[in-house]
Every structure is written in structure tokens, then in C-alpha cells.
């Protein structure tokens, strides 16, 4: 038993993952710590919802790793859904080795709720538009290792009463029995229901934002050097000393003004010069270049310098107003060009869409017509076959009608011949019968004569017998 427990503890220790984290506003104070998580290898890959697939020795504490920075606290509370009522507290921390992401430690009111939450949200996407999935791990313990900052975090004396903190939004007590508590990255605590109504990712108290600004890169080659931004649409591209994607954007869209991000100077591709220092002359209304010493370029009046600071400020403000007005006019003209450009694009898209719809309709009609033509050809062939069959049947009918007529004639002739033959045979039979009767009468007469001569002494009884015999013979002839 002891060896089995030792082996189980060693296998569990092999599956423990150590993650270093920090929290707090780095400008004020930062708390560092380490948390021990049960790695994914300890969790069974089976899709069964049974708790037997979960690691042994787990606690009602889980960690959501790698939450995107663009996901606000309200978004995450909405993602948790109905499980929010089983959460005691949530703490947002910053991972040391992961950029633009944060992690959340969640403690539940029971192990059953923790297991259900783990099985339901493990590997689930945060939203349908984001490819990031929820990576959940069970946490064994969380340890704070140190603090660095300008604020002294000394522990209060244990002798005095400790006042329970309140929510900065609703000013109610932060009690886990009444609702879950969420601690932000800057170590400010709120009710989950209160922070769910906060629209952005900043802290409602100190406005610390966990989402850091992104570095500008070229939208094509992703370089970070020699970048120019289009003044009209904001597209960032690299300059001519790299791959020239900013100039290519001007050639494609005709947006001629581009801002150099490093020096904040504006370049005009159409005029092939800088336009950020152009002002309008009051004498003739022409655009002239602003001198760095506060003087104007030669416009027929020579150059002037002002020693009065008030006059210099007024002139500078006037020049700034003129530059702003000129910039607004240029921007309006570019916006009008942009409008025409996109209207043209929309018209082209509309025409292409109509053309595709027409082609699809023509293709569908052509396929339908082809099917109907195939069916028509099959029907024509079937009709021709039936006509040929009918013609053959008509011909066969005539032939067989002739044969039947001939057979009837032959049958009539045969019957007539048989009748004639039978009639002739009957006549022959009658003659033969008559001849036989005549011969029998002649023979009887001769016998009578012979009997009369030979029996002269017959008695009356014998004569009676002779008479009776003659009657029988006569009857037989008649029969």
C-alpha cells in the first residue's frame, strides 16, 4: 500500500506544471507569485462526462490560461454564463512568458461545480469569431513570492478589527456569500455583477488597461522600420527605403498624403514634396513654406523677423490656423475623392455581382434546356420506335388477314368436299343396303320353296312355326 501511494504521488508530481505570474499596475506596485497547475496529460482525453476521467487530488480551483487581452471582464463573465453564481472569487493575473494575454484564477463553491465547469468549457471557443479556445487547468495551490513598488504593503495589526472592503461601484460589502468577487489586474476588487456592466477592459477605479497598444507594422510585409501612414484611410506601409508599400498604396487608391510616423511629417506623392509646413500668404493667397526661424519665404516683400513675443505668438497662431484650414480643405478634397473612389468600387462590385448572377442564371437555364432537349430527343426516338412498330403491326395485320381469309376458304372447301363425299357415301350405303335386302329376300324365297318340297308332311304346328319365322324376318328387314 505504501509503495502504491508513493508511486501515485510521484506520478502526480511529474504532471504538475509551474507557472509564474504577476499582478498589479507596474507603475505603482507589482505582486509576483507562482501557481502549480495539473497539466493536460493528467486529464483523460475521453469525451465522457464522468468525474473518473479527472485527475485525483484536484481542488475547487481552476486556472484559465491565455485569455486574449481584447476580451474584457464583462465578456468573460458573459462567457461563464450560469456558472457565475457558483463562483466565489476570480483573480486576473499576468503570465510572465505570454504577451497580450492574461490568465484568470477561479475558485468555486464546490468540487462538483468545478468539475462541471471544467468539462463544459475545456477546449471551447471564447466566441464564434475568435479562434482562441479556453484552456483550463486544475490549480493545486497559489503562492505569492514578493512585492515591488512604491506603496508599502504592510499588514495591519491583528489586534484591531479589520474592516471588510466594499465594491467601488455599488459600495456594498465584498462578501463571497452574496456574490462572486472579481479582482482585476491592478488588484482592485468588484462584484462580478457590477464588473459585468463595465464596457471596456480598463479598471473602473484607476483606469489601468490590461490591453497594451500594438506596435505599428507594415500591413503587407510586417516591417517596423521606416513606416508611413495614409492620412485618408490610416493604412500603414513601409517607405521607399524598404519595399515601398506606402507608395504602392497611393498608386492603387490615389491617396496622395502620407504621414511619416517617426518624424510626423506629411508627404505629398502628387507634388513629390513635404506639405506639413505650407501656409497661405496673405498678399496673394499662394502657398509658401514656413521658415524655421519664423520668417516667410520670398514673395515679393522680402523677409521679416519679429522680436516681440506677443506678435510672434499671434503670427504663429495665425499660421497654425491657416495650416489647419488648409489641412481641412485638403482632407475634404481627399475625402471627396475617396467617396468617388469607393462609389466606383461599389458600382464595379454591383456590376460584377449582376454579371455573376446573370451568368449563373444563364448557366442554370442552359442546363435546364439541355436536360429538356435530352428528354425531347429520347421522346422523339421512342415515338419513332412506336411508329415503326405500329407500321410493322399494320403490315402483319394485312398479311395475316389474307392468310386467315385463305384458311377460311380452304376450310369451307374442305367442309363442302366432306359433305359431298358423305352424301355420296350415304347414297352408296343406301344402294348397298337395298342390294343386301334384295339378296336376302331372294335367298329366303328359295329356302321356302325348298322347304315346301321337302316337307310335304309337316303338321299344322310346323306350318305355324314357319309363318312365325317369316314374320320375324319381315320385321327384321323393316328394321
Swiss-Prot record:
InterPro entries: BRAP2/ETP1_RRM, RING-H2_BRAP2, Znf_RING, Znf_RING/FYVE/PHD, Znf_UBP. A zinc finger (RING-type) spans 167-207. It comes from the Eukaryota. Residues 434-479 are annotated as: Disordered. Zn(2+) 1 binds at residues 218, 221, 238, 245. The keyword Ligase does not apply. Disruption phenotype: Viable heterozygous plants seeds are slow to emerge from the seed coat; emerged embryos remains white with unexpanded cotyledons thus leading to growth-arrested seedlings. One of its GO terms (molecular function) is protein heterodimerization activity. It catalyses: S-ubiquitinyl-[E2 ubiquitin-conjugating enzyme]-L-cysteine + [acceptor protein]-L-lysine = [E2 ubiquitin-conjugating enzyme]-L-cysteine + N(6)-ubiquitinyl-[acceptor protein]-L-lysine. This is BRAP2 RING ZnF UBP domain-containing protein 2. It comes from Arabidopsis thaliana.
